[in-house]
């Protein structure tokens, strides 16, 4: 009979306690913000706790204007610097040259390639020099995230630790915190969006749909991930070469 699995680090602790622990444990800590509700909560918690953490966000070049507006609102509200990371211009040029402006509509492979160029590679570069990063991923967001640990080895970025303080929180808990503390939130939520990414790859959802149903809605694939939060269980096959 095998040994029982070790207890999950910081499991059951409050998000604030997790963030304070991470801040004391990892001298070089980043908060990677999508500017969705969850990262807004984390930024607010960090501010209230006096946690000095570098806030990073990805500008893919295809974001809606409302996301740029949200970046400005966060800067103004918390008086912090938000480091905006952009993809490598040569990589984007090659992607567009070989596959067109909107390749993501043609196949899941090309969509994942676009996400890799515009999101995964830039994040990998931005995280160089850090020990750990905070993310707003929650287990209830999608079946692909149901096993999210509060603290885990980052398999995508060897040597880094990935910390998800809100892993056990529900959507209702997120929004209760936002309303209680008057946290600024992305304006597209008021227009029926429940998950917000790039403009051409995101739509509003209808009542009863999953939170991430508005992401890449034309795909039949159940794995609605861009690549920033792959796990061994939800990782797709390697991207096929397209002529």
What residue ranges belong to the model's regions?
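Nucleotide-activated chemistry modules centered on ATP-dependent adenylation/adenylyltransferase
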Residues: 1-243
């Amino acid at each position: 009979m095998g040994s029982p699995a070790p207890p999950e680090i910081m499991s059951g602790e409050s998000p604030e306690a997790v963030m304070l622990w991470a801040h004391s444990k990892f001298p070089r800590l980043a908060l990677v913000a999508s500017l969705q509700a969850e990262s807004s909560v984390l930024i607010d918690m960090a501010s209230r706790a006096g946690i000095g953490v570098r806030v990073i966000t990805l500008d893919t070049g295809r974001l809606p204007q409302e996301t740029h507006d949200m970046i400005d609102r966060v800067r103004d509200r918390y008086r912090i610097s938000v480091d905006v990371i952009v993809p490598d211009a040569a990589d984007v040029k090659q992607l567009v040259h070989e596959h067109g402006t909107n390749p993501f509509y043609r196949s899941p492979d090309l969509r994942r390639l676009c996400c890799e160029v515009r999101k995964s590679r830039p994040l990998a570069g931005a995280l160089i020099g850090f020990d750990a990063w905070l993310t707003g991923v929650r287990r209830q967001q999608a079946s692909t995230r149901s096993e999210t640990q509060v603290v885990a080895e980052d398999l995508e970025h060897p040597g880094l630790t990935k910390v998800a303080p809100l892993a056990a929180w529900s959507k209702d808990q997120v929004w209760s915190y936002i309303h209680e503390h008057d946290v600024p939130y992305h304006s597209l939520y008021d227009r029926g969006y429940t998950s917000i990414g790039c403009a051409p790859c995101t739509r509003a959802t209808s009542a009863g749909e999953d939170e991430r149903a508005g992401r890449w809605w034309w795909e039949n694939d159940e794995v609605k991930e861009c690549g920033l939060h792959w796990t061994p269980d939800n990782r797709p096959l390697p991207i096929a070469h397209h002529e």
